[in-house]
Regions:
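ADP-ribose/adenylate-binding Rossmann-like module
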Residues: 1, 277
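Glycine/serine-rich phosphate-binding loop and adjoining beta1-alpha1 elements at the start
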Residues: 3-192
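Beta-sheet entry/capping signal
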Residues: 124-126, 192-193, 220-222, 264-266
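A short acidic (Asp/Glu
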Residues: 137-140, 204-207, 232-237, 276
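Phosphate/oxyanion-binding active-site loops and adjacent basic polyanion-contact surfaces
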Residues: 165-171, 197-203, 241-249
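Glycine-rich adenosine-cofactor-binding loop
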Residues: 181-230
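Glycine-rich phosphate-binding loop and adjoining beta1-alpha1-beta2 segment
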Residues: 220-263
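S-adenosyl-L-methionine
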Residues: 257-276
Length: 277
């Protein structure tokens, strides 16, 4: 390769990484601690707002797990790329060695946090690396007496030899979901948006506004319509038979909360002149 395919290695990194998944639902604008949970299998979730994340997970029949998982995240400016030898890393030592080739500062932070948790006997930890374009991580079970280690081994030596489980991270936060479909464009996230009319065009438009970020990250989407969904509307409306004779604004808000959990959508059934937009 002679260093001529570095970009290709970075682009294909996710293919060579882990099969276990971590869903990340974090508002990057808000500093603070992160809560991590595991479903006990090959899926975990990290959030900074349990109520918002619970609404999303409930939609797909999961809900928020009860088993908490200690976690921390380290940011780096280095894009990950596979090594051309000894890949993928299988131990903490191999993972740290790889990180050192990318960003020595990041490696030091990861090792420091792992040692801190190892000393206080944290049983298992999730490590997330926030790098440009992609986030990834590893899970480590912090056993103090792994097979093959003698009593004279230091904590650091024991830590280095522990196996890792590679974790692929997928973002499910509102900002990412809006920006992913509008690369390079400004989204409606964080704005107050009003839509007058939830008929044939308005119903589909309301859904598109939601997918563009309206009603998320502190914003609000207000739908105004005084009419009800009638049988003659069913063949062409975004709403279906379950919304028959319901107020269109209210039914559309309910539908948006179903397809975009966590959205702040409000219905105004009446004259738009009386609405506080």
């Amino acid at each position: 390769l002679a260093g001529k395919m570095i970009e290709d290695l970075a682009e294909e990194f996710h293919i060579t990484w882990g099969r276990d998944w971590c869903m990340l639902d974090v508002d990057e604008r808000r500093p603070g601690s992160l809560d991590a949970y595991t479903f006990g299998g090959r899926v975990s979730i990290v959030t900074d707002d349990k109520a918002r994340t619970y609404a999303k997970l409930e939609t797909i029949g999961l809900g928020l797990p009860k088993v908490k998982l200690p976690a921390f995240r380290v940011r780096t400016k280095a894009r990950p790329m596979p090594l051309q030898e000894s890949w993928p890393p299988k131990t903490v030592q191999a993972f740290l060695k790889w990180q050192n080739t990318l960003d020595s500062t990041c490696r030091k932070k990861v090792e420091q946090r792992l040692m801190e948790m190892f000393r206080v006997k944290v049983p298992r930890v999730l490590v997330l690396i926030d790098s440009p374009q992609v986030q990834y991580g590893v899970a480590v079970t912090l056993k103090r007496d792994p097979a093959g280690m003698d009593n004279k081994s230091s904590l650091r030596e024991i830590l280095y030899r522990l196996p890792i489980h590679r974790i692929s991270v997928c973002r499910i936060d509102d900002r990412y979901l809006a920006e992913r479909n509008l690369p390079g464009s400004k989204t409606l996230a964080g704005l107050k948006v009003g839509l007058v009319g939830c008929g044939t065009i308005g119903g589909y438009l309301a859904e598109m506004l939601a997918k563009a970020g309206a009603g998320t990250i502190g914003g609000k989407l207000t739908l105004v319509d005084m009419g009800s969904l009638e049988p003659g509307n069913l063949g062409r409306h975004r709403l279906g038979f379950d919304a028959l004779i319901k107020k269109k604004a209210e039914a559309m808000c309910d539908e948006l909360r179903r397809v975009a959990p966590g959205i702040d959508a409000a219905a105004v059934v009446g004259d738009v002149k009386a609405a506080n937009m």
